Amino acid sequence: MPKYVMLSSLGPDGFARLRENPERLREVSTEVEAMGVTVLDQFAVLGQWDFLNIIEAPDDVTMAKVATTLASRGTLKTMTLPIIAIDDFIAGMRG
């Protein structure tokens, strides 16, 4: 199944919600998984982006649904990148 990196950056409203309820991060993961994907790992990061998630989804369309649903809430912006395992990448370069 394809994997993706989703980077997210919270806006002021997103930070306010997070300060009120830090467990909201886990709640959002549960909501995201209800859309048909699996959150494999989640990290807080420093810099331009606030969070990095590794997500497995059946296809690009499902992942686009997740990204647009989250962005439509107005509390964050996202960037989603498809990722390829290095072994698969090397095999593709050879083949």
Predicted regions and their residues:
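Generic structural signal for residues in well-ordered beta-strands
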Residues: 39-42, 78-80
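Short hydrophobic/aromatic beta-strand micro-patches
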Residues: 9, 54-56
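An amphipathic, aromatic/His-enriched active-site/gating alpha helix that lines ligand/cofactor pockets
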Residues: 57-84
